[in-house]
């Protein structure tokens, strides 16, 4: 049985934009966070791809990864993930081949099947209105070919890209990617940081369908976990109200800019909204290091996950840094 000490800890940054803040400051904060978690001992630092969201500045994922990798030295950096329906596989192979050539052995390519946007935004990204997600298995295979060794009959190559073998991960919040990752023998990351409902079933499907590959000889599961760590449980509960407001705004279709914490959420949400936010954040680790350690031990006992990737969207950058520092204490025992 796997123990908490056997599990790797990583970071997922949505590059949040705060109220009265700017994308430029958010991007600088992202690098500062990457530098800190590198020192804290985290395994990897991933950024997501989101479009047309005023509170998230990680839309140009590949460009941002170059900035992050250039400002760090040992931590792995990667996409969590590139939404493949938005892109031609060749372009992604060239972008990540370039990153791997510049920062060898430090680049991860996490792939998602959803567009990460609405239909209007998807059209603005120059893709078909519908159906592109159905091409995901073929697109993943094509991308893997571009990153693998060149074959004698291969007419189109990614340069850089060919032969770099950038590690591919499949990401998802449903059972589709879980089964595909298992069948392809790829590592699998489940988006339990916002969709924990099918977590246990997705892990089971992935492991049941797993076939050893040149990449993995046994399944490898990563789980997304929302994080709000503070010195006391009371302080963590207070800081978490910024997260609650953000999720509530997402559900209402409102602005996603980060708002400062409040003393109480009473009057800000309706009972059914409070329940919905609670479901969204069902796996959230909110509290002191002692409380979080106990909850993580239960999570690992139940899932036997190999790695946890934590996302922490607090209003003050200093509170985010401190949250990951406290979690590092849990990680190191």
Feature locations, PLM:
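N-terminal beta1-alpha1-beta2 module of alpha/beta enzyme domains
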Residues: 1-72
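Acidic (Asp/Glu)-rich catalytic clusters
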Residues: 2-5, 38, 65-74, 100-107, ...
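Flexible, glycine-rich active-site loops centered on histidine and acidic residues
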Residues: 5-23, 85-148, 188
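Conserved, mostly hydrophobic/aromatic
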Residues: 9, 37, 41, 49, ...
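Hydrophobic faces of well-ordered beta-strands that scaffold small-molecule active sites
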Residues: 9-13, 45-47, 77-79, 107-111, ...
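Active-site mouth loops of central-metabolism enzymes
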Residues: 13-28, 82-89, 162-172, 280-289
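An alpha-helical appendage that flanks or caps ligand/catalytic pockets
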Residues: 123, 129-157, 198-305
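A conserved active-site cap/scaffold subdomain adjacent to cofactor or substrate pockets
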Residues: 178-197, 202-203
């Amino acid at each position: 049985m796997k123990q908490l000490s056997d599990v790797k800890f990583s970071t997922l940054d949505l590059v949040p934009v705060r109220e009265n803040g700017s994308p430029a400051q958010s991007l600088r904060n992202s690098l500062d966070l990457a530098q800190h978690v590198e020192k804290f001992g985290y395994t990897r630092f991933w950024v997501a791809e989101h479009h047309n969201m005023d509170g998230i500045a990680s839309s140009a994922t590949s460009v941002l990864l170059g900035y992050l990798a250039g400002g760090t030295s040992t931590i792995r950096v990667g996409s969590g993930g590139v939404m493949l329906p938005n892109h031609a596989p060749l372009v992604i192979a060239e972008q990540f081949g370039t990153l791997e050539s510049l920062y060898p052995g430090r680049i991860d390519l996490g792939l998602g099947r959803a567009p990460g946007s609405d239909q209007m935004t998807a059209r603005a990204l120059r893709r078909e209105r519908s159906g592109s997600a159905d091409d995901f298995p073929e697109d993943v295979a094509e991308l893997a070919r571009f990153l693998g060794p060149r074959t004698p009959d291969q007419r189109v190559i990614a340069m850089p890209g060919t032969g770099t073998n950038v590690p591919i991960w499949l990401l998802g919040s449903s059972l589709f990617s879980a089964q595909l990752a298992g069948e392809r023998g790829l590592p699998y990351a489940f988006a339990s940081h916002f969709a924990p409902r099918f977590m246990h079933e997705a892990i089971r499907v992935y492991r049941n369908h797993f076939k050893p590959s040149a990449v993995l000889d046994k399944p490898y599961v990563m789980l997304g976990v929302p994080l709000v760590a503070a010195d006391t449980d009371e302080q963590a509960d207070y800081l978490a109200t910024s997260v609650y407001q953000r999720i509530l705004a997402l559900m209402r279709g409102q602005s996603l800019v980060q708002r400062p914490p409040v003393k109480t959420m009473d009057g800000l949400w309706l009972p059914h909204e409070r329940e919905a936010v609670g479901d969204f954040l069902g796996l959230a680790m909110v509290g002191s290091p002692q409380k979080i350690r106990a909850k993580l031990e239960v999570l690992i006992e139940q899932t036997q996950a190999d790695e946890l990737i934590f996302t922490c969207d607090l209003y003050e950058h200093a509170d985010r840094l401190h949250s990951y520092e406290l979690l590092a204490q849990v990680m190191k025992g």
